[in-house]
Amino acid sequence: MEALTLWLLPWICQCVTVRADSIIHIGAIFEENAAKDDRVFQLAVSDLSLNDDILQSEKITYSIKVIEANNPFQAVQEACDLMTQGILALVTSTGCASANALQSLTDAMHIPHLFVQRNPGGSPRTACHLNPSPDGEAYTLASRPPVRLNDVMLRLVTELRWQKFVMFYDSEYDIRGLQSFLDQASRLGLDVSLQKVDKNISHVFTSLFTTMKTEELNRYRDTLRRAILLLSPQGAHSFINEAVETNLASKDSHWVFVNEEISDPEILDLVHSALGRMTVVRQIFPSAKDNQKCMRNNHRISSLLCDPQEGYLQMLQISNLYLYDSVLMLANAFHRKLEDRKWHSMASLNCIRKSTKPWNGGRSMLDTIKKGHITGLTGVMEFREDSSNPYVQFEILGTTYSETFGKDMRKLATWDSEKGLNGSLQERPMGSRLQGLTLKVVTVLEEPFVMVAENILGQPKRYKGFSIDVLDALAKALGFKYEIYQAPDGRYGHQLHNTSWNGMIGELISKRADLAISAITITPERESVVDFSKRYMDYSVGILIKKPEEKISIFSLFAPFDFAVWACIAAAIPVVGVLIFVLNRIQAVRSQSATQPRPSASATLHSAIWIVYGAFVQQGGESSVNSVAMRIVMGSWWLFTLIVCSSYTANLAAFLTVSRMDSPVRTFQDLSKQLEMSYGTVRDSAVYEYFRAKGTNPLEQDSTFAELWRTISKNGGADNCVSNPSEGIRKAKKGNYAFLWDVAVVEYAALTDDDCSVTVIGNSISSKGYGIALQHGSPYRDLFSQRILELQDTGDLDVLKQKWWPHTGRCDLTSHSSAQTDGKSLKLHSFAGVFCILAIGLLLACLVAALELWWNSNRCHQETPKEDKEVNLEQVHRRINSLMDEDIAHKQISPASIELSALEMGGLAPSQALEPTREYQNTQLSVSTFLPEQSSHGTSRTLSSGPSSNLPLPLSSSATMPSIQCKHRSPNGGLFRQSPVKTPIPMSFQPVPGGVLPEALDTSHGTSI
């Protein structure tokens, strides 16, 4: 603007200092808020002054007056002042009120008046109903064409087949201008609603929520899906933003913005803020050819106004352009008047005097102007009989998606005053929109979704991965190409404190990309600002941890049982041993009085059952245990040892297996309870936001998420969280850290790990998925979703998944899937039943032993003594052993002191007498006999030694001993039954010089008498 002012300064000075004798002088009246009108008017005069082909040596002088907006009285005063100076024509750019007042004045003074209507506050223009001239001669010419917006809107809603819609207008818009439109819409049966929008846009929607019920608000929301906005560009932008923020707008909303005057940047602002489809109607002007863009007939226009590269043309308003062409129209009229030599000099007119006559050259000048035909900045300009400029053209823009700028506007059709609508407002079929297009794709590196492939120096980067394969399949099916680039910050997208977004979502919002693809999850927050296709892969959160190292312990053999179990087993051994010892003692005492021979091991039923039971408990039934109590003890102990050994073997195998598969964390609950391992995720990611929402939700009943969030958000996430997934994976591989991230990503990291040192614990926490993000309101969304569903139905997506997540890879992820939390030692309560069985067996054995003792003692008392008795040599041997413990066995026994009482042999039964006599060949055997103690004898008897072995051994007592039945153990463990001796017989005896033989002291050796 400063450059323009400096460029205009010399010409302004020239106009001020022009010769006083100039015959061309025009006046101009502008409103104070129309600074550009003033500058463009001066620039137009300067351009014409430099053009000798039009005015030759004559120059145009001018006088400018500035008035307040909508002040007709001031406008008349300033116009009268200009007429007093003497003017050939009056050029004005005002509102309708001032224009009506100036029309009456110029009609009375016969001063040609070229009027350019201004937009009131940027709102759409309505027609100015000028007062008719009393004598039928109208000196006011409307340089700007009449308003034709009603005709364009009616054709537009007809083409769109709208039956019900709402029209919003602001306070600057004259509702009377819609009367003709409403009349025609009513005749067509259209349901049209009108609503005024205050300057405070937010108050409009706030009042809706406070005054309407839910049902009414839903009906209003449905009506708002089809809306025409008769607002200023700034007002429309605020209105759409407020509708989107209050969720009154939807993705299928269609906004039609109607305004003759809106710039390209303002259109882009509307498109980017709108949710749904946007249609814009604005006035356009024909463009000249490139080599004649600044030439209009025989006039060259300043490059500031005709060259788009200068940039100033985009800043001009429509009224500025018509103002320039109005000056050009006057110059051409002056040129023709000079050529015809029908020039009328200017006259000084006084508006106040009643006797003042109008300018006599006014009629001729008006006719010359009305016959003019020029081509200027606005195209063709000429005036018809009704003093209006009929040539006007509109363009209709619709939402589209360009390969460079994303969501954009394209020209759908045009409308002009002669041909009407040229083009179609119907959207093209979706299938034809992607054919041949090149889409801009933004991505983020995330294995295995998107990875950098091997690149050639100097060529664009190439990418590979699961998402790239999906994108290639879609591109092949839909026929489009794509250019891919990485997000500058490498993030997926997170809403910042200033409500803006970073990452790939920010790229889509700013229209720098058409779509975004990577391991991006579909979340409600992201769906509020961008669109998503159908999910092409399910999503869940997993835990990546380092595999636990194998535990080695030399005392691992004690691990299967708890310490209390080992203690009880150790205590049971001596208890059972003592009980067996006692029962053996009792059995030995009982055997002294046993008179019946014992059958073989399997001769009785209970013995056979005992053999079967021994085989069952893997001990064998051939033991010589005959006592019932002993069998109960041994049976209980064998069952106890069988159960203990079997349990030990099974639990040891399981314990050693678990020690190799030990994983301390299996669920999020386990992770929140343990304190040894830290855990976290990527800051400002979807997983981070999920845990924050769950952890800070007061209605969440599960305290697990609250505990997880406290650890994750510690120190603002700086302690445990990472900046990107790669850092989290590296940290998990080092150990003592659990990385919470997408299962698909961490599974791939575990499958491709060089050392296979990490594992994944899957834990589905949400029903989300991975999708393709597109710009908000993108028409490609449904097309992408349809193709993704087709890929799923044909199984192509499963093939791609198997390519990047093979079931059988170098690393096995299933080896830890069934592992328990840790190896459990069997506690004492697990073995309580076994110990109870043993205790019951021991108690039962004690009871049976007591009953046996009682029974045997009673039976011995009831038996009468018999002549034929048996001497239990085994008992005698034990008795002698006890005596030998008292050092008797260590004394030398003199051979001369040994006597052996003769046994009676006459009482032998015939069968017994025929028993063969056992001969011992060893003549050096030392023989001792042990007889029951007598009252007159000691514990030992002496035999008189003699030189010959055949000497008779006299009895030490003349009394004859009673008949005694003796038993001793045979070498095979059985008992020999000896016949009673009736008659004393001599026995040969050979003394042993060396003393007592050791065998004589051993109770295991039997002695035959």
UniProtKB/Swiss-Prot annotation:
Ranges of Polar residues composition bias in the record: 931-942
The record's subcellular locations are: Postsynaptic cell membrane
What GO CC terms are in its UniProt record? AMPA glutamate receptor complex; dendritic spine; GABA-ergic synapse; glutamatergic synapse; plasma membrane; postsynaptic density membrane; postsynaptic membrane; trans-synaptic protein complex
Q: Which residues lie on this side of the membrane: Extracellular?
A: 21-562, 659-830
**Which portions of the sequence form the region Disordered?**
931-960
GO biological process terms, semicolon-separated? modulation of chemical synaptic transmission; negative regulation of synaptic plasticity; phospholipase C-activating G protein-coupled receptor signaling pathway; regulation of postsynapse organization; regulation of postsynaptic membrane neurotransmitter receptor levels; social behavior; synaptic signaling via neuropeptide; synaptic transmission, glutamatergic
Q: Which GO terms describe its molecular function?
A: AMPA glutamate receptor activity; G protein-coupled receptor activity involved in regulation of postsynaptic membrane potential; GABA receptor activity; identical protein binding; metal ion binding; transmitter-gated monoatomic ion channel activity involved in regulation of postsynaptic membrane potential
Function, as annotated, reads:
Member of the ionotropic glutamate receptor family, which plays a crucial role in synaptic organization and signal transduction in the central nervous system. Although it shares structural features with ionotropic glutamate receptors, does not bind glutamate as a primary ligand. Instead, forms trans-synaptic adhesion complexes with presynaptic neurexins and cerebellins, regulating NMDA and AMPA receptor activity and influencing synaptic plasticity through signal transduction. In the presence of NRX1B-CBLN1, forms cation-selective channels that are proposed to be gated by glycine and D-serine.
The protein's matches in PANTHER family, at most eight in alphabetical order, are given as: IONOTROPIC GLUTAMATE RECEPTOR
Q: What is this protein called?
A: Glutamate receptor ionotropic, delta-1
Q: Which organism is it from?
A: Rattus norvegicus (Rat)
Q: What is the lineage of its organism?
A: Eukaryota, Metazoa, Chordata, Craniata, Vertebrata
